[in-house]
Amino acid sequence: MSEGQVGRRPIGKAVLIAGPTASGKSALALELALAAGGVVINADSMQVYRDLRIITARPTRADEALVPHHLYGHVDAAVNFSAGAWVSDAAKALEGARAEGRLPIFIGGTGLYFKALTAGLSVVPPIPAEVREDVRARLERNGVEALHAELAARDPRAAGRLNLRDRTRIARALEVIEATGRSLLDWHQEGQPPLLPRDSFHAVFLAPGRDELYARIDARFDAMLGAGALREVERLAARQLDPLLPAMKAHGVPALIRHLRGELSLDEAATIGRADTRHYAKRQFTWFRHQLPEFEWVKPEEARGWLAAIVNAAQDEG
């Protein structure tokens, strides 16, 4: 049965495909979309950026032409795109897929996006830029220990849940209490309901062996350089955006910008980019294991069997 034949029938549960970078998620999602009349919805926080097609390994234009793809490259790099903004866009994509009778397939490696999708999201108001910038300046000037002590004095509950390695989360908690007068924990308790309740999705986490994954990460980074990643980063750097913006911190971008400034050789920048990506993959394993235990862990060589079961389930649910 062709994609066109199945693409308009009613669909049951959504499918969530997660995993570390370079684990083969995109290929699996495309195969499932073709087999089950699906639409691919991005759940990767870096692949949303228009400026970063190559360095973030977004699907190719040829793949995008085969089945509908949503939430890829739809945000300018100058935007500090939040999880809340993604959830809003994802809700529209999910509604559109269901209206067309297509299987919604969420794919990516950003754990917070999947957590928001399946467990809801807190309703913290937007933090004024001046508050955020002031907290960041204090972090750089005084260090993380001083910032954590400040948080402990103002929001001991939040501080008690964070250690000194959580620089970003410490700063975030302090921003929230300064801007709103309320603890981040209180805001979390008033969160939005999930887009996908527990019984409304199938979820898989692709888990290659570490050695295999790291080899794939290294090879893919080199392939991205060969495909023009350096020129892409050069165009991004020419915009002179705030280096703290998410797009400016995508894996490989800071090191390649340092190369363009003459601070690193290309080999040195590539070595840093590969290492940063491997470290991120390691953190992804840890995060999903502890935060999203409902995901079924599958080795890449077992993925086809899982995919066949999902196709059969989609047909039964539709």
Swiss-Prot record:
Keywords in alphabetical order: ATP-binding, Magnesium, Nucleotide-binding, Transferase, tRNA processing
One of the GO BP terms on file: tRNA modification
Annotated positions for site Interaction with substrate tRNA: 110, 132
Enzymatic reactions: adenosine(37) in tRNA + dimethylallyl diphosphate = N(6)-dimethylallyladenosine(37) in tRNA + diphosphate
Binding residues annotated for substrate, in chain numbering: 21-26
Region annotated Interaction with substrate tRNA, chain positions: 44-47
Enzyme Commission (EC) number: 2.5.1.75
Binding site residues for ATP: 19-26
Gene3D superfamilies reported for this sequence: 1.10.20.140, P-loop containing nucleotide triphosphate hydrolases
Cofactor: Mg(2+)
Molecular functions per Gene Ontology: ATP binding; tRNA dimethylallyltransferase activity
Coiled-coil annotated residue ranges, if any: none
SUPFAM superfamilies, alphabetized: P-loop containing nucleoside triphosphate hydrolases
Stated role: Catalyzes the transfer of a dimethylallyl group onto the adenine at position 37 in tRNAs that read codons beginning with uridine, leading to the formation of N6-(dimethylallyl)adenosine (i(6)A).
Subunit structure: Monomer.
Similarity comment text for this entry: Belongs to the IPP transferase family.
Full protein name: tRNA dimethylallyltransferase
Organism per entry: Bradyrhizobium diazoefficiens (strain JCM 10833 / BCRC 13528 / IAM 13628 / NBRC 14792 / USDA 110)
